[in-house]
Design a protein with these regions (language model features):
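Long, low-complexity, intrinsically disordered terminal regions
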Residues: 1-376
Length: 376
């Protein structure tokens, strides 16, 4: 890994160099070699404007084509939102904002490993990819994750779509809906899907044959909203002859599932424990009037595992039996985590981006960053 740049304040030089050494050590596990960056020093107590001005000088106005930048923040980590927003939305360069208090503590190597995962994803590297069945491959599926995060004043909506057959390349968009305009929320997804279909076509020279939409941030009780959002999506897909599923994702379920075992060494005494990763529940506790299922994607060693509920609110694909396995496969390939997560990678990424959008009031992503995962 070379041709990168690191910004820091002069009083933090020793700490930032230790961080670089730890990053280099952590990279051994990935068989990477990290060359030393170009160091750019700022005065102590520099404002967010000073950081942005210096960053633009090197990354936007300069002649060097740096692959990415790290901003190392000491006690001034309150400027994190401004740096994140500027790099993602204004001038569109790939960056990693590092808070000193996160890396200067026990477990620094572990933190650096996670940072390397993020950097790898931001630069387009593939840590994991899904290998789907041939029958699924023929469907040319585009998976989409949509999440809404709410504050008292606004709603942040993020939409992430896969645009390759291993579900590891993405087209992204986020939007801010102010409280007084919240009725516009139901039209966001359909307009995004049109853009995502075009991005898929640009990359693959054809449009997807089917779309699976994972929707979080909306409940079954919001029937009017759901009906209108699905209607808008249906109109877009119908004009392009694309079949789709619209699946509500609920991680806040009250059910717990356990596996029963018999202890042969103790006269067959029964005991219960968390299920292995991949538990699928299709009946018994599901809604009989709808296609609904529960998946326990992770194996939990402490406490009790909470499954995720997937409720199919609409679908016109002819093979619904492939949906649970496809969903479980996507839980394995979230770029920002080593292992499985509770929800498919597209919805996990949308969850992260929607929270950032609502909290930091992000504008539209820079055109250069609408594909990829620069927001991680």
């Amino acid at each position: 890994m070379s041709n990168w740049i690191c910004f820091y304040e002069e009083s933090n030089y020793d700490d930032v160099y230790d961080f670089y050494l730890n990053l280099s050590k952590a990279s051994d596990a990935y068989n990477l070699k990290i060359l030393e960056p170009e160091w750019v020093k700022l005065k102590n107590k520099s404002s967010a404007k000073d950081w942005i001005k210096k960053a633009d000088e090197f990354l936007y106005e300069g002649q060097n084509d740096y692959s990415f930048a790290i901003f190392y923040l000491g006690k001034n980590d309150y400027i994190y939102p401004q740096l994140k927003k500027h790099s993602l939305c204004n001038n569109g360069y790939i960056s990693q904002v590092v808070k000193a208090r996160s890396v200067n503590k026990k477990g620094a190597l572990s933190v650096c490993s996670k940072i390397l995962l993020q950097i790898n994803a931001k630069l387009g590297g593939i840590s994991y990819k899904a290998v789907v069945d041939k029958d699924v491959e023929k469907l040319k599926i585009m998976a989409i994750g949509v999440d809404s995060s709410h504050t008292s004043k606004r709603t942040g909506v993020a939409m992430i779509a896969t645009i390759n057959d291993s579900y590891t390349d993405f087209y992204n968009k986020e939007d801010i809906i102010e409280e007084e305009n919240k009725s516009q929320l139901q039209f966001c997804v359909s307009s995004f899907i049109e853009e995502a279909i075009q991005a898929y076509k640009n990359k693959n020279k054809e449009i997807p044959k089917s779309i699976i939409i994972y929707r979080q941030g909306v409940s079954l009780q919001q029937k009017t909203f759901l009906k209108e959002e699905i209607k808008q999506i249906e109109e877009v897909c119908k004009t392009k002859n694309i079949l789709f599923y619209y699946i509500l994702v609920n991680t806040k379920t009250t059910f717990k599932f356990f596996e029963k075992y018999e202890d042969e060494e103790n006269e067959g005494e029964e005991y219960y424990c968390n299920p292995e990763s991949g538990l699928l529940i299709l009946d018994g506790v599901t809604n009989r009037n709808y296609f609904e299922f529960y998946i326990q994607p992770q194996y939990v060693t402490e406490g009790s595992a909470t499954p995720t509920c997937f409720h199919v609110a609409y679908g016109n694909l002819n093979n619904p039996e492939m949906i649970p396995k496809f969903t479980f496969d996507l839980c394995h390939i979230y770029s920002n985590w080593q292992g499985t997560v509770r929800i498919p990678n597209v919805i996990k990424a949308a969850e992260k981006l929607s929270k950032m959008t609502a909290k930091y009031k992000l504008g539209e992503l820079n055109e250069e960053l609408k594909e990829g995962q620069a927001y991680l």
